[in-house]
Amino acid sequence: MSTKYVEVGELKEGSYVVIDGEPCRVVEIEKSKTGKHGSAKARIVAIGVFDGGKRTLSLPVDAQIEVPIIEKFTAQVLSISGNVIQLMDMRDYKTIEVPIDYVEEEAKGRLAPGVEVEVWQILNRYKITRVK
C-alpha cells in the first residue's frame, strides 16, 4: 500500500485520506479549540473514492493521518465485457481489469474500445476518472 502520514491540521478540503482502509476525498473539515487547556480538534467529513460512502472522523489537529499516494496514468480501453473494462497501461503495456462501478459517471457514456482514458491507482485499486 502506497501511503504517507501527515498531520490532520495540514489537511484541506479536496485532499485525500484513508479512513477505515478506504481512500476518501475530504469534502468538509472543521477545526475547533475545545477550551482553555484542551487541544484543538478537527472534524473531517469525507466521501469514499470507490464506494461513495460518507465517513466522519474526529481527531486532534496534531495527530497523524494516513494519506494515499495517487498515481495517475493514461491507458487505452481494449474491451468492455459485462461489468469489466479491460485496459492497457500505456507506460508498460500491461493489461488491467477495472469494474464498471469504478468509472466516473461522466466518463461511462464515452467509453469504447480504442479510447484513451486517465486512470488513478489508489491503494492497489484502479479508477477511470475521465476520457481523454
Swiss-Prot record:
CDD domains associated with the record: S1_aIF5A (cd04467)
GO terms of biological process kind: positive regulation of translational elongation; positive regulation of translational termination
Pfam family, one: eIF-5a
PTM-bearing positions, type Hypusine: 36
Subcellular location as annotated: Cytoplasm
SUPFAM superfamilies associated with the record: Nucleic acid-binding proteins, Translation proteins SH3-like domain
Alphabetical UniProt keywords: Cytoplasm, Hypusine, Initiation factor, Protein biosynthesis
This protein's record includes keyword Protein biosynthesis: yes
GO terms for MF: ribosome binding; RNA binding; translation elongation factor activity; translation initiation factor activity
Domain of life per record: Archaea
One GO location term (cellular component): cytoplasm
InterPro entries cross-referenced by the UniProt entry: IF5A-like, IF5A-like_N, NA-bd_OB-fold, Rib_uL2_dom2, Trans_elong_IF5A_hypusine_site, Transl_elong_IF5A_arc, Transl_elong_IF5A_C, Translation_prot_SH3-like_sf
Similarity comment: Belongs to the eIF-5A family.
The protein's role, per its UniProt record: Functions by promoting the formation of the first peptide bond.
Protein name, per record: Translation initiation factor 5A
Species, as recorded: Pyrobaculum islandicum (strain DSM 4184 / JCM 9189 / GEO3)
Gene name of this polypeptide: eIF5A
